[in-house]
């Protein structure tokens, strides 16, 4: 009681210390709360798996290359060359699956959108144009627990795939997805049937709900083969998954093969990117932000006993 009376009697002289402690407490509470929410979000399933996966950055030879082919010398389109490249990749003993996509691969930061009507709801999900093997490469999981195979088959049947979280949380109508039809708002002649439903697919490890609704539409080979001058290698995502146990030197091995075995027409592999590196580079800003918050939390935790020591020393005097 004597200590409390002394603190009360000296409340004016100790006011700045108590104010400092209050500010520290408020800021610390904010940082701890932010850290908890961020950590909980980070460890939630992302809906895909990038283990043993690679992205192949493609490019074209220019007329200064000794092996460059002019338009008169070429008998194939760029789309045909890309398909031939993926077929050669599939024949490699280390490769499990290869996919072609556009604005669809994880951690890309580049998107395509669609405006679709399903029942009475108009939604604007991300549009992911992919070949069926995309789901095998990145291990999307069917909402019914049967793995990626139902999603692969859905695209092969000419249907589309959506995530199980396609409906807004406040939607009161029938929340069934499988078998329903969606109409393109901009072109009512385009009608898509939902043939597969995946588990929720997040945009990255740090965003809980942003851009996590999507519709996957098949990118048919018959359309690819017709594309030439209007197609740019940088807009084509060739990704692959290697078999478990494959050497970590696979990217280097692939680049050695690219000179002779994997060069098609003027198309060649410019670089092979390990997907773990893509993930880290894409999220580097978020990692830095987390690091700064941890330093702040450490500083504030250190500041509390220092302020308390100052307060006790002042009370002793």
What feature does the model see in each segment?
Residues 1-8:
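A short amphipathic helical element positioned immediately N-terminal to and/or at the very start
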Residues 7, 89-90, 258-259:
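Hydrophobic C-terminal alpha-helix "anchor/cap" residues
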Residues 9-10, 262-300:
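Membrane-helix entry/capping segments
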Residues 12-40, 48:
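Short, strongly hydrophobic transmembrane alpha-helices
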Residues 17-27, 296-308:
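Alpha-helical transmembrane segments of integral membrane proteins
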Residues 34-122:
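Membrane-proximal extracellular/periplasmic loop immediately following the first transmembrane helix
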Residues 103-281:
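Mid-to-C-terminal secondary-structure elements
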Residues 310-317:
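Single conserved hydrophobic/aromatic residue that forms the stacking wall/gate
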């Amino acid at each position: 009681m004597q200590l409390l009376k002394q603190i009360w009697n000296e409340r004016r002289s100790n006011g700045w210390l108590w104010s400092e402690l209050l500010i520290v407490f408020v800021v610390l509470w904010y940082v701890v709360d932010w850290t908890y929410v961020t950590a909980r979000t980070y460890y939630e399933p992302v809906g895909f798996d990038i283990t043993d996966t690679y992205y192949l950055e493609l490019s074209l030879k220019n007329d200064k290359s000794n092996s460059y082919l002019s338009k008169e010398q070429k008998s194939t389109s760029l789309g045909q060359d890309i398909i031939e490249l993926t077929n050669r990749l599939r024949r490699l003993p280390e490769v499990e699956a290869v996919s072609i996509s556009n604005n669809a691969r994880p951690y890309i930061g580049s998107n395509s959108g669609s405006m679709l009507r399903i029942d009475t709801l108009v939604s604007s999900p991300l549009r992911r144009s992919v070949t069926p093997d995309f789901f095998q490469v990145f291990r999307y999981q069917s909402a019914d627990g049967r793995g990626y195979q139902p999603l692969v088959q859905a695209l092969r049947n000419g249907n589309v795939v959506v995530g199980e979280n396609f409906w807004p949380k406040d939607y009161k109508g029938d929340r069934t997805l499988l078998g329903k039809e969606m109409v393109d708002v901009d072109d009512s002649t385009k009608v898509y049937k939902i043939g597969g439903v995946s588990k929720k697919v997040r945009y990255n490890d740090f965003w809980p709900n942003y851009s996590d609704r999507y519709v996957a539409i098949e990118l048919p080979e018959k359309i690819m083969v017709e594309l030439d001058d209007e197609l740019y290698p940088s807009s084509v995502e060739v990704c692959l998954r290697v078999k478990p146990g494959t050497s970590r030197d696979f990217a280097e091995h692939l680049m050695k093969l690219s000179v002779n075995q994997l060069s098609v027409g003027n198309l060649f592999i410019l670089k092979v990117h390990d997907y773990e590196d893509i993930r880290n580079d894409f999220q580097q800003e978020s990692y830095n932000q987390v690091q700064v918050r941890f330093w702040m939390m450490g500083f504030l935790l250190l500041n509390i006993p220092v302020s308390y020591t100052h307060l006790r020393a002042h009370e002793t005097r």
